[in-house]
Swiss-Prot record:
Region: Disordered, residue numbers: 140-161
GO cellular component: cytoplasm
Pfam families: RRF (PF01765)
Gene Ontology molecular function: ribosomal large subunit binding
Organism this protein belongs to: Rhodococcus opacus (strain B4)
Family (UniProt): Belongs to the RRF family.
Name of the featured protein: Ribosome-recycling factor
Length: 185
């Protein structure tokens, strides 16, 4: 019972870190990166579909992204979605593919993006801590129901604290790397 609670908590913490990694990856840096487009999508036959599933996205140069839709009919919709996104880029459509020149970030914009990265990191740490709290409640319930002794639950709580600290440190490291990447000129 205790092992199941710890395993489930660790699994959920891992998911929180994965979501944080994806969120941080969607924040654009000064370089072109296909991950910038992970959160952009269009209405495709009645369903919201990410453009990463509707087009090939290549980075031939450090500041250039080329988006080639699998269906030519989706070209304008994809271009509009990119233009309306919060990426701050201006796509150009040549009839077959979309070229996106990624401009250099201003110092002010870099600072805003660092704040955004820290905010997303903090959200991830809150998620990890919420998982810990729920697992602690579960351990208390196990002890109260007499399914495990006080010593076993105490050891499990210490193990849970170590696991929580490890995942919080992973999130901190992700944010630190993203911050360094954003501030690099």
């Amino acid at each position: 019972m205790i092992d199941e609670a710890l395993f489930e908590a660790e699994e959920k913490m891992e998911k929180a870190v994965t979501v944080a990694k994806d969120d941080l990856g969607s924040i654009r840096t000064g370089r072109a990166n296909p991950g910038m487009f992970n959160r952009i999508g269009i209405d495709y036959y009645g369903a919201f579909t990410p453009i990463t599933q509707l087009a090939s996205i290549n980075v031939p140069e450090a500041r250039l992204v080329v988006v080639k839709p699998y269906e030519a009919s989706q070209l304008n919709a994809i271009e509009t979605a990119i233009r309306n996104s919060d990426l701050g880029v201006n796509p150009s459509n040549d009839g077959n593919l979309i070229r996106i020149s990624v401009p250099q970030l201003t110092e002010e914009r870099r600072r805003e993006l660092v704040k955004q990265a820290k905010s997303k990191g903090e959200d991830a740490k809150v998620s990890v801590r919420n998982v810990r709290r729920k697992a602690m409640d579960e351990l208390s319930r196990i002890q109260k129901d007499g399914e495990a002794g006080e010593d076993e639950v105490g050891r499990a709580e210490k193990e849970l604290d170590k696991t929580t600290a490890r995942y919080v440190a992973q999130v901190d490291e992700l944010v630190k790397h993203k911050e360094a990447e954003l501030l690099e000129v």
